[in-house]
Amino acid sequence: MYRPRLLGQNLRGFTLARTCRRTYITDADVESARRYCLTQLQNSDYDAHLIRRFVPSPVQDTYAALRTLNLELVRLPELVSNPTIGSFRMKFWQESIDNTFAGRPPREPICILLHKGLQDLEARDGNSTKKSIKFWISRLIKTREKHMTNRPFANLASLEEYAENTYSTLMYTTLASLPLRSMHVDHLASHIGKACGIATILRGIPVLAAPPPPVNTPSGQVPAVREPALLLPLDAMAEAGVKEEEVFRQGPNAPGLQDAVFQVATRANDHLITAREMLKRLKAGEDPGHEFEHQGEAEHFYTEGSDTLREIRQGFGVLLEAIPSAQYLQRLEQADFNPFAVKTAGWKLPWSIWQALSKERI
């Protein structure tokens, strides 16, 4: 999960010439790209930095590239002064992904490492899921572009849609890279990703609602261009009587804030509870208890006669995304749903991830 921090890393890919293309990538290029992506995750998305170690080794490079791409897209609102520039940068990333899938990755660390992951996938299993992977990445980019302005969500349903199209989509992409095409595992990923996306919005409140610090660029520090923002759904804010300006001025003392946060956090927790119950039922040989709402959409097409237990074991490392979100929601509850008072996970998070993997429990 993206940990909201205003670390102003430059968008390296955007500063590179778009005309720079080559089809041959050396081992040194891949190693340099891997170091870059891992450093980004360690500094700015520690949850993903930990989980990467537990996803199946054949997709660890792809996972690192995907999560670093997500970081770059999340950072864009901090670095652009108007929507037009933001759209140009999003277009750059889409073109870079298109070229990477065409075998012409630009000299950009994320694309180089993703290209390596795609080559490894082709060597393992051909191109059976390559189309799906490209679809999911493109959906991530389009969704990030749509939400670049940091406007509040209209309601909880629109927040869930955002979470499905970002964090669930990242999980679908990783699963397709194994490759694993499983309705039940995708169904679990959908609920977990929704919980992750909602929890990320809550985690971002103390950062986005505060005046932004300067952004680091290759030329030095520059003033951040964004205004303070509060992304809580408007219906939850209205029900709790929360006003944006009061949150910007008063922070945790803003009237109704904790009530609104409680309502949103409850929805995230509901998705985790649903995923846990589903996992228990599936491991017991039962049906999941409810239908997958996205079955038949986009790339959600599956074959009959699959081995559910084998698929769960194969994809369980990806489902570990649930653990950081679950721990955050627990700490949020301990702080009486004051997002400004949530403590860090510390040493408990890596231990909890390892335990979850060992026991196959989320």
Question: For the regions a protein language model found, what residue spans apply to each?
Answer:
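Short pre-active-site segment immediately N-terminal to the catalytic Zn-binding motif
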Residues: T129, N155-L159, L180-S190
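Transmembrane alpha-helical segments that form the membrane-embedded catalytic/substrate-channel core
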Residues: G197-I201, Y328-Q330
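Short, surface-exposed polybasic-aromatic patches that bind anionic ligands, especially phosphate groups
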Residues: T15
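Acidic/His metal-coordination segments adjacent to aromatic residues that form catalytic metal sites
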Residues: E145-L156
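Fungal eukaryote-biased detector of long internal structured cores
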Residues: A123-S132, W136-R139, M148
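Catalytic cores of Mg2+-dependent Asp-rich isoprenoid enzymes
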Residues: Y2-G8, C20-Q119, I137-L140, A163-Y172, ...
